[in-house]
């Protein structure tokens, strides 16, 4: 499918510069940019319109017909650069289910006030209804001046629009601003303006990843993320925006922050030899080489307790058929050059996924596409320590079938998808193989990999996973490319499958987009062409609602 993402990004930058010149002549640039939607508390009747402006906006607002919704201003100051960012959030309620609305975003000092930004969105349907959503993670920006950014991120946003989903799930590692610590707001700005092409037309629902952890930006480093997004309330005091749930039709979506439970230390990190020194005005001291921002356990168990309550309520509700979980890090990834799987998720959350029959888990983290067989329970002592070969209990997920016939009953086991195939310049479509028996192999973190010194003075590193296992749960890997988008079509009508509801999943991939394909060595370039890689169907018995 075609697209003009890179040209559009360049044109947007030119228009933004012209707007800034006009607005400054009027005493400050409150022109809306980085416009994006999220669901409100009830997706059938509410959305949140969020945006930013280069300078403080005067009376920022959204207009729908004759109705004006005033926005909440939510600024923050970046803890490294000292730059202040102005964001705005307008909560729009009282909408009709399944309806399309046009809206305007503006302010008194909007340089485009004569022709303000206008877009449309559609609310979720009420009750059991068919709908489509899309997903990927690890997007980055098209501005290759930034670490890990790559032109494919513009085409990935175009791909979302081409499929016209009701909404998009963005599975963490949004823009990698933490890897560009002295210019974090600029990276976020490029990310937001790139996404606006799609996110202004339909909600983009994110989750936190390890690269949303930034030095000197809040207790867990999430200030940049939390300031930009207004997400459904989890009703857990002190932890708003970090995890949440929402309901559309017969599907309960649960969005989690796996940073809270994983062993892997992969947040902000000063490798050295130089310290990271915030600007003087921030009041923050230099961050010394070897410092990492490790947030495992930050909620003190509050997130896992909330998760169990939410899953239990979902399975007790006869109008809920499907439960889909979104997180960044993986319980089932066999990437050879990426991160792999994490025992922390397997210990704390997979037993809950089993107990409450979570159907589908969508992740990112490894920059590839991988699908598991349906899994339930765990195989004990199936792993080995990399350093010594000693047996390690990795709690390897147990496949309930290893027959890959393209149709899976998720009431019998949970399917995991790794979808870190957004747009970064580090493609990781290279997968583990046990050289002893040619079995698929996965790396597993079973303990923290805190920074250790290297042989170079004042330079530190973090080790990879400490264990490996035969990945008998791995069903499908995309070795052609590390870029793609998953499209999900929810069919609540059970007639086609004898009393079962279904979700059809199609993974589209961007072949030849890899900077260098790890299997062939072939050099590629960003491409707008996404073609079908695989299609499969998930089934589960339809719940019976009381009459």
Locate predicted features.
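Divalent metal-dependent phosphoesterase catalytic cores across multiple superfamilies
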Residues: 26-242, 308-313, 338-356, 374, ...
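Residue-level recognition of conserved structural "scaffold" positions that shape functional pockets
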Residues: 9-12, 144, 179, 216, ...
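Metal-dependent phosphoesterase/phosphodiesterase active-site architecture
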Residues: 19-61, 86, 110-115, 140, ...
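N-terminal export signals
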Residues: 1-14
């Amino acid at each position: 499918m075609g697209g003009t993402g890179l040209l559009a990004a360049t044109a947007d930058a030119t228009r933004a510069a012209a707007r800034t010149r006009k607005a400054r002549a009027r005493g400050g640039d409150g022109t809306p940019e980085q416009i994006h939607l999220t669901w409100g508390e009830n997706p059938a009747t509410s959305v949140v319109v969020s945006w930013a402006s280069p300078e403080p906006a005067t009376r920022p607002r959204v207009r729908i017909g004759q109705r004006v919704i005033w926005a909440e201003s939510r600024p923050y100051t970046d803890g490294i650069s000292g730059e202040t960012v102005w964001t705005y959030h307008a909560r729009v309620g009282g909408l009709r289910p399944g309806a399309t609305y046009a809206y305007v975003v503006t302010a008194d000092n909007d340089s485009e006030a004569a022709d303000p930004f206008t877009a449309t969105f559609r609310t979720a349907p009420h009750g059991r209804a068919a709908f489509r959503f899309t997903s990927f993670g690890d997007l980055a920006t098209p501005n290759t001046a930034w670490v890990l950014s790559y032109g494919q991120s513009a085409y990935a946003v175009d791909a979302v629009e081409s499929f016209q989903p009701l909404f998009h799930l963005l599975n963490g590692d949004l823009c990698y601003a933490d890897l560009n610590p002295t210019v974090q707001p600029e990276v976020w700005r490029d990310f937001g303006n790139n996404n606006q092409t799609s996110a202004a037309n339909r909600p983009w629902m994110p989750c936190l990843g390890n690269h949303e952890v930034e030095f000197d930006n809040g207790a867990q480093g999430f200030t940049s993320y939390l300031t930009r997004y207004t997400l459904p309330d989890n009703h857990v005091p002190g932890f708003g925006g970090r995890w949440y749930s929402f309901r559309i039709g017969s599907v309960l979506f649960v969005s989690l922050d796996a940073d809270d439970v994983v062993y892997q230390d992969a947040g902000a990190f000063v490798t050295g030899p130089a310290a990271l020194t915030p600007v003087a005005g921030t009041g923050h001291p230099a961050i010394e080489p070897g410092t990492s921002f490790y947030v495992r356990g930050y909620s003190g168990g509050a997130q896992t307790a909330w998760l169990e309550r939410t899953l239990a309520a979902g399975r007790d509700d006869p109008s809920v058929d499907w439960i889909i979980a979104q997180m960044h890090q993986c319980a089932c990834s066999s990437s050879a050059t990426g991160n792999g799987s994490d025992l922390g998720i397997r210990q704390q959350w997979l037993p809950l996924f089993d107990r409450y029959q979570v159907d589908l888990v969508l992740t990112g983290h490894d920059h590839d596409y991988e699908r598991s067989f349906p899994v339930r329970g765990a195989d004990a002592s199936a792993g080995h320590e990399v350093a010594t070969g000693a047996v390690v209990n990795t709690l390897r997920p147990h496949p309930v079938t290893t027959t890959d016939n393209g149709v899976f009953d998720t009431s019998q086991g949970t399917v995991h998808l790794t979808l870190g195939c957004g747009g970064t310049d580090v493609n990781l479509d290279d997968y583990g193989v046990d050289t002893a028996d040619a079995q698929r192999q996965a790396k597993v973190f079973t303990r923290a990999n805190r920074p250790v010194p290297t042989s170079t003075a004042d330079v530190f590193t973090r080790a990879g996973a400490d264990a490996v296992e035969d990945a008998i749960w791995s069903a499908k890997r995309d070795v052609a490319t590390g870029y793609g988008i998953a499209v999900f079509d929810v069919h609540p009508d059970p007639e086609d499958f004898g009393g079962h509801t279904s979700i059809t999943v199609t993974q589209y991939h961007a072949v030849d987009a890899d900077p260098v394909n790890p299997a062939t060595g072939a050099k590629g370039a960003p491409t707008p062409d996404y073609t079908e890689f695989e299609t499969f169907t998930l089934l589960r018995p339809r719940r019976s609602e009381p009459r």
